[in-house]
Design a protein with these regions (language model features):
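Acidic/histidine-rich helix-loop elements
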Residues: 1, 19-33, 60-67
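Serine-esterase "nucleophile elbow" of acetyl-processing enzymes
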Residues: 1-21, 37-45
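Alpha-helical cap/lid subdomain in secreted, periplasmic
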Residues: 34-177, 181, 185-204
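Short, solvent-exposed mixed-charge patches
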Residues: 207-208
């Protein structure tokens, strides 16, 4: 459920999207604020719980957010178990790539937060949970559009282009609308091509 009409792309008569994400939260702080408790009141049998963390979990400067990769597993299991207890299907999604090409030796984009991605893949195998590797897919995509193309996806804004950012902005973490649509399209494509088991078949049918 989105407050922005332009963001409603993949909802259908048979699939309602309730976006419970909150900016600046990690798997730890989201839980500590009681947001999982709120989610548990809404989720029901037959639902899917897609979860993506890591950007804030890896931030050692924010004690209330930071978790080690090992603690990351502990927190993700709380979300996984909450979904299962209510007859819903948990789905893990690796964190999208950041615009890091300015910091890599070869100027290429890389998978962000690799230790957390690896842990999520491990959790998927260990507990038989579907994993959508959006982290790798977005890094690969950014390498196709390149340095300049990536600026049109992330919040690289010219001075005066937007009223809310009169001085412009250079943000390598957050997406513009074009980036959000591109990455959502990648996610939808990965769901459509998921063939490890039949756990996502209901969503795949709605995206067909």
């Amino acid at each position: 459920d989105s407050d922005f009409d332009q963001s409603i792309i993949y909802e259908t008569d048979g699939m309602f999207i309730d976006n419970r994400a909150m900016a600046g939260r990690s798997s730890r702080s989201y839980f500590d604020e009681g947001r999982l408790d709120d989610l548990k009141k809404a989720i029901k049998s037959g639902d899917y719980l897609f979860m993506q963390f890591a950007h804030n979990d890896a931030n050692k400067e924010k004690e209330e957010r930071y978790v080690t990769p090992e603690q990351y597993e502990e927190y993700l299991l709380r979300y996984i178990n909450a979904a299962k207890e209510r007859g819903a299907q948990p789905v893990l999604v690796t964190a999208i790539a950041m615009r890091d090409c300015d910091d890599t030796p070869d100027g290429k984009f890389s998978v962000s937060f690799p230790e957390y991605r690896d842990k999520m893949l491990e959790i998927g195998d260990k507990y038989d949970i579907p994993v959508i590797d959006l982290g790798k897919a977005t890094a690969d995509y950014l390498n196709t559009v390149g340095d300049e193309g990536s600026k049109k996806l992330f919040m690289w804004l010219e001075k005066g282009a937007y009223e809310g950012y009169p001085d412009g902005k250079q943000d390598n973490a957050h997406l513009q609308q074009a980036g959000a649509k591109a990455f959502a399209g990648l996610l939808a494509g990965l769901i459509r091509s998921y063939d490890r088991d039949d756990k996502l078949d209901k969503v795949k049918a709605e995206l067909a």
